[in-house]
């Protein structure tokens, strides 16, 4: 049997929103989450369907690759901490070396990006609009506490589908705020409300952050 359990990979990911969460947490600031714990419908998207992302394209992971987009880096500081929601996205940036190659440990071949289309855990079907498109992804280990970015093999950005059905190209240079910021909410991430901490990119990922931004 293959490392992906015989399942077909996927090159699309669903928007989980601008908050670093494990796959089994109930919360979501985006348009998708755990189906058995969370109900999101068009009426609940107060930011507007033309200003909120649903899906992004995503690179499928490549076995033994250390390249950003094709692999997920392992961050040892996440392993040492049990509540990663208070970790900044900049942790992933610190793991990238020359030529967009990860410098340390990477996830094993069974936990590659997009490796299983019917699996609702972070590496496979979610992205978090906290680092800009084509930024690095990192996590604790295996499928736990993985911060996945939107990614593509297009130069300069990614295509996203917004809730009104339009497809937009988003540049890697989009305003993504300050990656060193955190919600500061380690025990109650559901209390994270209001405008995104991660600029226009994060605002496009939040479904009810009350931001007045449009897709660039």
Language model features by range: what are they?
Residues 1-19:
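Surface-exposed loop and adjacent secondary-structure segments within mature catalytic domains
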Residues 16-216:
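Hydrophobic alpha-helical interface faces used for helix-helix packing
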């Amino acid at each position: 049997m293959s490392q992906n359990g015989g399942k077909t990979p996927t090159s699309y990911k669903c928007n989980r929103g601008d908050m670093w969460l494990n796959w089994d947490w109930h919360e979501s600031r985006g348009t998708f989450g755990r189906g058995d714990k969370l109900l999101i419908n068009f009426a609940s998207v107060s930011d507007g369907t033309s200003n909120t992302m649903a899906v992004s394209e995503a690179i499928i992971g490549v076995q033994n690759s250390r390249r950003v987009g094709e692999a997920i880096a392992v961050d040892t500081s996440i392993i040492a901490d049990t509540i990663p929601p208070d970790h900044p996205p900049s942790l992933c940036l610190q793991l990238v070396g020359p030529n967009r190659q990860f410098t340390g440990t990477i996830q094993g071949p069974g936990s590659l990006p997009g490796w299983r289309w019917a699996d609702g855990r972070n590496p496979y079907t979610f992205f978090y609009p906290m680092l800009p498109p084509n930024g690095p992804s990192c996590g604790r280990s295996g499928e736990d506490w993985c911060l996945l970015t939107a990614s593509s093999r297009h130069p300069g950005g990614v295509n996203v589908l917004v809730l009104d059905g339009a497809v937009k190209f988003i540049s890697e240079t989009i305003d993504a705020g300050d990656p060193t910021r955190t919600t500061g909410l380690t025990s109650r991430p559901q209390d994270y409300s209001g405008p995104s901490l991660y600029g226009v990119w994060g605002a496009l990922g939040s479904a009810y952050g009350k931001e007045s931004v449009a897709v660039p």
